[in-house]
Amino acid sequence: MTLLDPLANALSHITNSEKVGKSEVYIKPASKLIGEVLRVMQENGYIGEFEFIDDGRAGIYRVQLLGKVNKAGAIKPRFSVKAKEYEKWEKRFLPAFEFGILVVSTSQGVMTHKEALEKGIGGRLIAYVY
């Protein structure tokens, strides 16, 4: 079976492991984008520490779970968003105002929609977490 979307697979793996009550999860294959999304999730308190393990192939991320993720998913297709449009997409993907984050890939790196709004930059929506 081929893996079509590694980011969506990683986020659903995290969500399912949280629901079962696991304390850690191994995500493979690893990529720079998955690592950046994990960093944003860690900065916002959704996951604990994570580390990259080199297995001689694409690599593996070991992620400590804190039990704070209700749902995490990739946004397909990756919509382009202007700085003024974040509220519209917040209503579409997040369950309530100021609850959860949208992960945005911008020209200045991967960040939350709140950080991008403060900086006044747009980007592409890649994931949501709440």
Curated annotation (Swiss-Prot):
- Respond yes or no to whether keyword RNA-binding is given for this record: yes
Q: Name one GO cellular component term.
A: ribosome
Q: InterPro entries this protein is in?
A: Ribosomal_uS8, Ribosomal_uS8_CS, Ribosomal_uS8_sf
Pfam families, per database record = Ribosomal_S8
Q: Which UniProt keywords apply?
A: Ribonucleoprotein, Ribosomal protein, RNA-binding, rRNA-binding
> SUPFAM superfamilies in the record, alphabetically?
Ribosomal protein S8 (SSF56047)
- GO annotation, biological process: translation
> Can you name one GO molecular function term for this protein?
rRNA binding
What binding partners and quaternary form does the record give? Answer: Part of the 30S ribosomal subunit.
- Which PANTHER family does the entry link to? 40S RIBOSOMAL PROTEIN S15A
Family the UniProt entry places it in: Belongs to the universal ribosomal protein uS8 family.
Instruction: Tell me, in a sentence or two, what this protein's role is.
Output: One of the primary rRNA binding proteins, it binds directly to 16S rRNA central domain where it helps coordinate assembly of the platform of the 30S subunit.
Name of the featured protein? Small ribosomal subunit protein uS8
* Organism annotation: Thermococcus sibiricus (strain DSM 12597 / MM 739)
Q: Which gene encodes it?
A: rps8
